[in-house]
Curated annotation (Swiss-Prot):
GO biological process, one term: oxalate metabolic process
Domain Cupin type-1: 50-192, 228-369
Regulation: induction: Induced by acid pH but not by oxalate. Positively regulated by SigO and its coactivator RsoA.
EC assignment: 4.1.1.2
Organism: Bacillus subtilis (strain 168)
Protein role: Converts oxalate to formate and CO(2) in an O(2)-dependent reaction. Can also catalyze minor side reactions: oxalate oxidation to produce H(2)O(2), and oxalate-dependent, H(2)O(2)-independent dye oxidations.
InterPro entries: Bicupin_oxalate_deCO2ase/Oxase (IPR017774), Cupin_1 (IPR006045), GPI/OXD (IPR051610), RmlC-like_jellyroll (IPR014710), RmlC_Cupin_sf (IPR011051)
Location of the protein in the cell: Cytoplasm
Name of the protein in question: Oxalate decarboxylase OxdC
Catalysed transformations (reactions): oxalate + H(+) = formate + CO2
Length: 385
């Protein structure tokens, strides 16, 4: 990519030309490999990127919520997401929805509640790096603690909308008062102050201690916690970074969503691989990345990502994620499945006869000798001589 007066231009060697019309130069700077794609890109490949910065933001007195769904990123038919921020003490009101909800706490801390169909209550505090999972149809809430909270929500249906959930206050606002009174065994006068519309996100005082909020019931405790301390587990570490994996094998309740938190150091990359079970949905937390997706039949397309971007890789398509910045790249891989699975290109070739691989790639023993039978999700790039 050539630059004129620090302005990027779509020129590679003797191909391309300078841009003469008005344009968004900052967007071009953020997407160098889209402005000037690698020579290896070819054919028509669907868009696999959308930024939360380009979404509508729902502002409330206690915080905000914005979403990336199939409406914003059409290829993402199986997963949708919400970025939510709550001020200290603010509450995402009691509600439920048809879709299961998976969450990663990015900033601050919050208290979550959920009650299952047997009337068993679960209440816990979650902090940065923690997860929660609420099965479809079960009522729950989120309240920010002292520092406030910001988190990513992922739902197992791409057409989910944060504006179409079942709210406690919305339901009661659209139910006759005499019915509500009869249901709870009170008079209409005793419920005269019920809100006339949904609260959704609203300000409130900070809660007391977690111990004081625990509610014991006659039906005992839930069999498995609905929260998970992801960063307390041992990651898969390599020279180039580390990976934390959470799925139904270690986070028992997470039956429809599996995940990986990936850190890629500068000069390293998430290795060439693919996923044999489902599509991959991504959220970029920090750093700068590029990813090329191989769609078969000679088709491939490269994308750039940074904090706040959503990425996507369709089922079984080969790809890598490279750190192109000077700080650690941190991102989430999310899958609509009960378990995490990937196939490493390096390991695949290492587990085949050497001469068989050499015949395919027209490479010699020097190449096959360095193949690894062990999987290394993140690899450090070797400098060329």
């Amino acid at each position: 990519m050539k630059k004129q007066n620090d302005i990027p231009q779509p020129i590679r060697g003797d191909k391309g030309a300078t841009v003469k019309i008005p344009r968004n130069i900052e967007r071009d700077r953020q997407n160098p490999d889209m402005l000037v794609p690698p020579e290896t890109d070819h054919g028509t490949v669907s868009n696999m990127k959308f930024s939360f910065s380009d979404t509508h933001n729902r502002l409330e007195k206690g915080g905000y919520a914005r979403e990336v769904t199939v409406r914003e990123l059409p290829i993402s038919e199986n997963l949708a997401s919400v970025n939510m921020r709550l001020k200290p003490g603010a509450i995402r009101e009691l509600h439920w929805h048809k879709e299961a909800e998976w969450a990663y706490m990015i900033y601050g801390s919050a208290r979550v509640t959920i009650v299952d169909e047997k009337g068993r209550s679960f209440i816990d505090d979650v902090g940065e790096g923690d997860l929660w999972y609420f099965p479809s149809g079960l009522p729950h809430s989120i309240q920010a603690l002292e520092e406030g909270a910001e988190f990513l929500l992922v739902f197992d249906d791409g057409s989910f909308s944060e504006n179409s959930t079942f709210q406690l206050t919305d339901w009661l606002a659209h139910t006759p008062k005499e019915v509500i009174a009869a249901n709870f065994g009170v008079t209409k006068e005793e419920i005269s102050n019920l809100p006339g519309k949904e609260k959704y996100i609203f300000e409130n005082q900070l809660p007391g201690s977690l111990k004081d909020d625990i509610v014991e019931g006659p039906n005992g405790e839930v069999p498995y916690p609905f929260t998970y301390r992801l960063l307390e587990q041992e990651p898969i570490e390599s020279e180039g970074g580390k990976v934390y994996i959470a799925d139904s094998t270690n986070f028992k309740v997470s039956k429809t969503i599996a995940s990986a938190l990936v850190t890629v150091e500068p000069g390293a990359m998430r290795e060439l691989h693919w996923h044999p079970n489902t599509h991959e949905w991504q959220y970029y937390i920090s750093g700068k990345a590029r990813m090329t997706v191989f769609a078969s039949d000679g088709h491939a397309r490269t994308f750039n990502y940074q904090a706040g971007d959503v990425g996507y890789v369709p089922f079984a398509m080969g790809h890598y994620v490279e750190n192109i910045g000077d700080e650690p790249l941190v991102f989430l891989e999310i899958f609509k499945d009960d378990h995490y699975a990937d196939v490493s290109l390096n390991q695949w070739l290492a587990m085949l006869p050497e001469t068989f691989v050499q015949a395919h790639l027209d490479l010699g023993k020097d190449f096959t000798d360095v193949l690894s039978k062990e999987k290394h999700p993140v690899v450090k790039k070797k400098c060329s001589k």
